[in-house]
């Protein structure tokens, strides 16, 4: 299975046979092709798609805005969706006939919807560009092509979030409920973490009506290292937000989940869309390129020395330090590469935003901060925080990066504290959000991003709220968030010892709130989309390595180096590794509550086979006849290796429970449980009761 091409077109822009080319907004082939398709070939493909769509829709009385179809054409399978009543987005895949481990079509169809929702979140709706379709084409090139090219290079992107990715209009919530967790045992004297945010931030007179909402996410890293602990995925997702009228909550949540699961972490570069996969050069290609450039190395070296000498003689009064000149010399090759990349991207019309590399590289003519001023700023920040909370001393590394509390790291990823030399998206990321109670409902809001270990905070600000540009306000905001997240971290992760492995996993989809509560582990086996694809690496990784390794340099004091969310900066220090590490001794990285179930002990291959089996049952359930006003389907299925799957669907929710029957205490005990609850119909059906007491007790605790 491999991605073949993707196209976006609008048939309404064509009025006759002579201007059919106007309807084509985007057409991109993945990988290498033997010959470049002509415009007529592209138009013929979208013409066939329109014809089949019209034929199959002729008997359907529906507006068509949320329609989707799967079309088989020659050796391709084409996923096609219609959005905003007139725009079509089509994705074609090929080479699936002999692929026994092919990805189910539901995953790719869901990601086609997600790609549209993400584009709308970042750039606005397609219909908003009615007066400037050229700009729409440019934005489609800058977002859609890199988005799907990352999937083409790493096909497991569409499957690594388990069932939660199949429903693009829903979002996953974090669930910290555990058999050992009793909310009544909390100390009521201490202020809760969400009360701190509500009272000290949202309702504070400085922020009132300026901050629209605060979204709190728990995004722990997945780790396969033997010396690192893993945590159940039931805690992954949105912890909570503080408004009930944010209609685009599923979109912003799924966008963050996609970024985190695709690249393995969250950083400033990733949030601003400046990170994508690329193929590492093969050894032969590197050697050939080296031979081609050896003849130019000596001339470039002489020219570089001549320019450096002229610059030094012309700037004798600038008094640049040795470290500053070294930084300048090191970045010269990057500037040469940037010029070439920028020229190619300009002529092809692809990815203008990805050619901003030199904006991220420090230059020697910046207003550098002396070491004394830097120390003074650190002392002032530390003293102000000590006065606010003497029991939690804060050690600030940088006003933009943040600091540490014990073994925890915190700081802003996106905020006005970042250097003005960076693009504006690093100061505030504009997202197209829809608030039900707002006048315009849908508008672009300034969003700041802040992290505390594995917790990511999204601060949604009104476009006219200028308080976020004040340094003191952001410092105070960071301090209040630190207090809140420290309470949350202690409450849900380290409150009680419990490392039990549950004998069941579940997925609950609420059709009213659009929430998904799931404990099914993430992950899938490796899918090779193309044998010609070599090892992958992140395109911005080299710049991140350069920035972080030199974060203590005087020439970078005003640079505010970009950080990565999590307990440790996985790139900057050689002693850190991937996972939950905080750059300290591994012995301290022990979680008292891990939220694991028996599926966490399965291999990726067996877990994937289980997901495919459950997906087949879900498909058969959805294809069955049902009353649109009221229906209820309930099934208990036996899978391989003694695994039971309970599925129940009605108008309000979908419930999937995967039970390891071998870990039950015996069928006799289950029979007793059935007799115990048989007289009380409110406890559930006999099929549900047969899952065992641990499942029924868990369900009763949810209802409480």
From Swiss-Prot:
Keywords: Autophagy, Endosome, Membrane, Protein transport, Transport, Vacuole. InterPro entries: Ccz1, CCZ1/INTU/HSP4_longin_1. GO terms for cellular component: cytosol; endosome; intracellular membrane-bounded organelle; late endosome; Mon1-Ccz1 complex; multivesicular body membrane; vacuolar membrane. The YPT7 guanine nucleotide-exchange factor (GEF) activity of the MON1-CCZ1 complex is autoinhibited by the N-terminal disordered region of MON1. GO terms for molecular function: guanyl-nucleotide exchange factor activity; phosphatidylinositol-3-phosphate binding; phosphatidylinositol-5-phosphate binding; phosphatidylserine binding. It is a peripheral membrane protein. Residues 281-322 are annotated as: Disordered. Its main location: membrane. GO terms for biological process: autophagosome maturation; autophagy; cytoplasm to vacuole targeting by the Cvt pathway; late endosome to vacuole transport via multivesicular body sorting pathway; macroautophagy; protein targeting to vacuolar membrane; protein targeting to vacuole; vacuolar transport. It holds the Pfam family Intu_longin_1. It comes from the Eukaryota. It is found in: Endosome, Multivesicular body membrane; Prevacuolar compartment membrane; Vacuole membrane; Vesicle. Coiled coil: none annotated. Belongs to the CCZ1 family. In complex with MON1, is required for multiple vacuole delivery pathways including the cytoplasm to vacuole transport (Cvt), autophagy, pexophagy and endocytosis. The MON1-CCZ1 complex acts at the fusion of vesicles with the vacuole, through its regulation of the SNARE complex during the coordinated priming and docking stages of fusion, and particularly at the stage of tethering/docking. Forms a complex with MON1. Interacts with YPT7. Interacts with YPT10 with a strong preference for the GTP-associated form; may interact with other small GTPase Rab5 homologs but at much lower levels. Present with 2870 molecules/cell in log phase SD medium. This is Vacuolar fusion protein CCZ1. It comes from Saccharomyces cerevisiae (strain ATCC 204508 / S288c).
């Amino acid at each position: 299975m491999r991605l073949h091409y993707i196209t976006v077109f609008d048939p309404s822009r064509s009025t006759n046979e002579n201007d059919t080319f106007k309807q084509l907004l985007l057409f991109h082939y993945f990988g290498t092709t033997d010959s470049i398709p002509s415009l007529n070939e592209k138009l013929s493909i979208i013409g066939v798609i329109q014809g089949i769509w019209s034929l199959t829709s002729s008997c359907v009385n529906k507006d068509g805005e949320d329609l989707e179809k799967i079309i088989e054409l020659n050796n391709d399978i084409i996923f096609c969706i219609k959005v905003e009543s007139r725009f079509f987005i089509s994705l074609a895949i090929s080479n699936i006939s002999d692929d026994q481990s092919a990805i189910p079509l539901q995953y790719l169809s869901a990601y086609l919807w997600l790609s549209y929702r993400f584009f709308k979140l970042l750039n606005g709706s397609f219909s908003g560009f009615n007066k400037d379709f050229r700009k729409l084409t440019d934005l489609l090139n800058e977002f859609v092509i890199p988005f799907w090219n990352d999937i083409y290079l790493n096909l497991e992107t569409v499957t690594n979030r388990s069932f939660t990715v199949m429903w693009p209009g829903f979002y996953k919530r974090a669930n910290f409920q555990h058999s050992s967790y009793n909310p009544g045992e909390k100390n009521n004297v201490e202020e809760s973490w969400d009360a701190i945010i509500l009272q000290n931030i949202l309702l504070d007179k400085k922020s009132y009506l300026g901050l629209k909402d605060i979204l709190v996410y728990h995004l722990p890293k997945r780790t396969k290292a033997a010396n690192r602990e893993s945590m159940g995925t039931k805690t992954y997702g949105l912890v909570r937000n503080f408004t009930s009228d944010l209609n685009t909550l599923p979109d912003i949540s799924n966008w963050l989940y996609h970024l985190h699961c695709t690249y393995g972490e969250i950083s400033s570069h990733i949030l601003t869309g400046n990170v994508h996969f690329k193929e590492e050069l093969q050894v032969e290609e590197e050697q050939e390129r080296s031979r081609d450039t050896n003849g130019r190395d000596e001339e470039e070296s002489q020219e570089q020395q001549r320019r450096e000498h002229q610059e030094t003689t012309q700037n004798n009064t600038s008094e640049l330090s040795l470290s500053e000149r070294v930084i300048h010399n090191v970045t010269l090759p990057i500037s040469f590469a940037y010029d070439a990349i920028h020229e190619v991207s300009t002529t092809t019309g692809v990815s203008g935003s990805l050619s901003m590399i030199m904006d991220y590289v420090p230059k020697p003519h910046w207003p550098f901060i002396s070491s004394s001023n830097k120390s003074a700023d650190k002392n002032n920040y530390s003293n102000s925080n000590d006065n606010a909370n003497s029991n939690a001393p804060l050690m600030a590394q940088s006003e933009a990066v943040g600091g540490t509390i014990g073994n925890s790291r915190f700081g802003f990823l996106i905020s006005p504290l970042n250097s003005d030399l960076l693009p504006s998206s690093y100061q505030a990321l504009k997202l197209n959000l829809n608030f039900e109670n707002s006048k315009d409902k849908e508008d672009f809001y300034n969003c700041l991003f802040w992290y505390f270990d594995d917790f990511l905070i999204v601060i949604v600000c009104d476009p006219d709220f200028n308080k976020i540009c004040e340094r003191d306000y952001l410092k105070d905001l960071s301090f209040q968030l630190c207090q809140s997240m420290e309470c949350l971290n202690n409450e849900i992760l380290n409150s009680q010892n419990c490392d039990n492995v549950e004998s069941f996993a579940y997925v609950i989809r609420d059709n009213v709130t659009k929430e998904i509560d799931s404990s099914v582990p993430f992950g899938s086996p490796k899918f090779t989309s193309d044998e010609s694809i070599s090892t992958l690496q992140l395109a911005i990784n080299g710049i991140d390595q350069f920035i972080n390794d030199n974060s203590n340099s005087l020439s970078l004091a005003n640079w505010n180096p970009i950080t990565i969310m999590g307990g440790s900066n996985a790139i900057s220090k050689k002693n850190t590794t991937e996972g939950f590490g905080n750059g300290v001794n591994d012995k301290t990285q022990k979680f008292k509550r891990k939220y694991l179930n028996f599926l966490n002990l399965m291999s990726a291959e067996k877990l994937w086979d289980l997901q495919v089996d459950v997906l087949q049952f879900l498909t058969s359930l959805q294809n069955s006849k049902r009353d649109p006003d009221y229906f209820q389907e309930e099934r208990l299925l036996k899978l391989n290796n003694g695994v039971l799957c309970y599925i129940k669907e009605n108008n309000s929710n979908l419930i999937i429970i995967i039970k390891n029957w071998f870990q039950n205490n015996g069928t006799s005990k289950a029979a007793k449980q059935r007799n115990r609850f048989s007289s009380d119909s409110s406890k559930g059906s006999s099929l549900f009761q047969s899952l065992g007491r641990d499942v029924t007790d868990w369900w009763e605790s949810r209802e409480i």
